[in-house]
C-alpha cells in the first residue's frame, strides 16, 4: 500500500500521451521520463495488484457481467501486467486488444501466454493514440484513475480510444465516476505548521551565520524561501488514509462524469460550487479530504446485470493505494455543528506538467443562523 506523501503515479496504467490538447503539446520523451517509465517496473505493478479493493471491484465487474464480454471484442487501455485483459478473455471475450505504452507489454505478453490466452489476447506495445486496430470494439476497459480521480490525465487517452474504436453500442468499464470533497479534522495540520516553522527557524539561523561568517546578507531571499517551504509543507496535497471519524461535515460531489460521453475539455478544468454542513460539535476545520468513486453500470440501453462500485472513500476496513488527498489549512478554524461551508473549487492542470493538478479553493463559513463567520481562499497542488 502507498504511504508516502506523493511519489510516482499509482492510479492508472501507461496508455498514451493524452492530456496536452492543441493548447499544450506534449513532449513524448519528457512525458515518458516523468510518467510512463514508472509503470515499466514489476514492483509498481505488484503494488497495484495487491490492492484488494481495486482488484475485487474490477474482478466482480467483469465476472458478474459476463454478458458484456461473452463473444465480444474488448480494448484494454493501459493494460500494465495484463490482468484486465486476461479477465476479459476468461469471461468469454472473442478478442482482446491489450495496449501498453511501456516495456511492461513484454511481461503482459508472457503472462497472457502462460495462462493459455494468447489466442484471444493480443498485447500491443505503443501509445493508444498511435496504434491501429483492425476492428471496432464492444467494450473498453481501463484502470485510468489517479489521485482525486484526475491526476495523471490518463482519462484523455481513454477518451481518444473511445472516440476512435468503441462501437456506437459499446460499453465503458468503468462507466461513471465521481469526485468527492469533505471537511476534516486532523493533527496533520499542526504537524505541518510545526515543520514549516522549523524550516523557517533553520533558515534564519543559516542566514545569520552566512552574514556573520562570510559577510553576505541573505535577507532578500527570506520571502521566496518562505513561499517555497509553504508550498511544500502547506499547499501540496498529501496522501492519507483518513478515518471516517475525521470527516466533520457532509461529503459533497464536486464532479460527476459519464465515461461514455465525457470530453477532454470537461476535465481539463473542473469548476464546482457546493455546500457542506458541519455535523460535529465543537471541532476544528483543519482542511479538506478529496477522494473518488467509479461505477460499473453499463449503458442505459445495455445495463450491467450487477452494478459494481469502486470507492476510495475513508474506511475503517478497506484502504486503497489511492488513499485520499488531504488539503490542509495552515491555521485551523473552530467550527460548530450546523455551520455551513460554501465551497468554490477550481481544479486545472499544471502549466509545467499536464499530469499534475492545481486547485483553488474558496470557502465561506456561515453559522446555522446565517451570520457570516469566516472566509478564506487557498491554493493547493496535487503532485
Swiss-Prot record:
The segment annotated Disordered runs over: 1-23
Q: What enzyme category does the UniProt record give?
A: transferase
Question: PROSITE patterns in the record, alphabetically?
Answer: SAM_MT_PRMT
Task: List the biased-composition ranges (Gly residues).
Answer: 8-22
Quote the Pfam families the UniProt record gives.
Answer: PrmA, PRMT_C
Q: Which reaction does it catalyse?
A: L-arginyl-[protein] + 2 S-adenosyl-L-methionine = N(omega),N(omega)-dimethyl-L-arginyl-[protein] + 2 S-adenosyl-L-homocysteine + 2 H(+)
UniProt keyword annotations, A-Z: Methyltransferase, S-adenosyl-L-methionine, Transferase
Which residues are named in the active-site annotation? 143, 152
Q: Which family does it belong to?
A: Belongs to the class I-like SAM-binding methyltransferase superfamily. Protein arginine N-methyltransferase family.
Tell me which PANTHER family the record gives.
PROTEIN ARGININE N-METHYLTRANSFERASE, PROTEIN ARGININE N-METHYLTRANSFERASE PRMT10
- Function, please? Methylates (mono and asymmetric dimethylation) the guanidino nitrogens of arginyl residues in some proteins. Essential for regulating flowering time.
Q: What name is this protein filed under?
A: Protein arginine N-methyltransferase PRMT10
Protein source organism: Arabidopsis thaliana
Q: Which gene encodes it?
A: PRMT10
Amino acid at each position: 500500500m502507498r504511504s508516502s506523501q506523493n511519489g510516482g503515479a499509482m492510479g492508472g496504467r501507461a496508455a498514451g500521451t493524452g492530456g496536452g490538447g492543441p493548447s499544450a503539446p506534449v513532449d513524448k520523451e519528457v512525458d515518458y521520463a516523468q510518467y510512463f517509465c514508472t509503470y515499466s517496473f514489476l514492483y509498481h505493478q505488484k503494488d497495484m495488484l495487491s490492492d484488494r479493493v481495486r482488484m475485487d471491484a474490477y474482478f466482480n465487474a467483469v465476472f458478474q457481467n459476463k454478458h458484456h464480454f461473452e463473444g465480444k471484442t474488448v480494448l484494454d487501455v493501459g493494460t500494465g501486467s495484463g490482468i484486465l485483459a486476461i479477465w476479459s478473455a476468461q469471461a468469454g471475450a472473442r478478442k482482446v486488444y491489450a495496449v501498453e505504452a511501456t516495456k511492461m507489454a513484454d511481461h503482459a505478453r508472457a503472462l497472457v501466454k502462460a495462462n493459455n490466452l494468447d489466442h484471444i489476447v493480443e498485447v500491443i506495445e505503443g501509445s493508444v493514440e498511435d496504434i491501429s486496430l483492425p476492428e471496432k470494439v464492444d467494450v473498453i476497459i481501463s484502470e485510468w484513475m489517479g489521485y482525486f480521480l484526475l491526476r495523471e490525465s490518463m482519462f484523455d487517452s481513454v477518451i481518444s480510444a473511445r472516440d476512435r474504436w468503441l462501437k456506437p453500442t459499446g460499453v465503458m468499464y468503468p462507466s461513471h465516476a465521481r469526485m468527492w470533497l469533505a471537511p476534516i479534522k486532523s493533527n496533520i495540520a499542526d504537524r505541518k505548521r510545526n515543520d514549516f516553522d522549523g524550516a523557517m527557524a533553520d533558515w534564519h539561523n543559516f542566514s545569520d551565520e552566512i552574514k556573520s561568517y562570510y559577510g553576505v546578507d541573505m535577507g532578500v531571499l527570506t520571502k521566496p524561501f518562505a513561499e517555497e517551504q509553504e508550498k511544500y509543507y502547506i499547499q501540496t496535497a498529501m496522501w492519507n488514509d483518513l478515518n471516517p471519524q475525521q470527516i466533520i461535515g457532509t461529503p459533497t460531489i464536486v464532479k460527476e462524469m459519464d465515461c461514455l460521453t465525457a470530453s477532454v475539455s470537461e476535465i481539463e478544468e473542473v469548476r464546482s460550487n457546493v455546500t457542506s454542513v458541519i455535523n460535529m460539535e465543537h471541532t476544528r476545520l483543519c482542511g479538506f479530504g478529496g477522494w473518488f468513486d467509479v461505477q460499473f453500470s453499463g449503458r442505459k440501453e445495455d445495463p450491467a446485470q450487477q452494478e459494481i462500485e469502486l470507492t476510495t472513500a475513508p474506511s475503517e476496513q478497506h484502504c486503497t493505494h489511492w488513499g485520499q488527498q488531504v488539503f490542509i489549512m495552515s491555521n485551523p478554524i473552530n467550527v460548530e455543528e450546523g455551520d455551513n461551508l460554501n465551497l468554490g473549487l477550481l481544479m486545472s492542470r499544471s502549466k509545467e506538467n499536464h499530469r499534475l493538478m492545481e486547485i483553488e479553493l474558496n470557502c465561506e463559513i456561515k453559522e446555522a443562523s446565517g451570520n457570516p463567520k469566516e472566509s478564506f481562499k487557498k491554493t493547493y497542488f496535487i503532485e
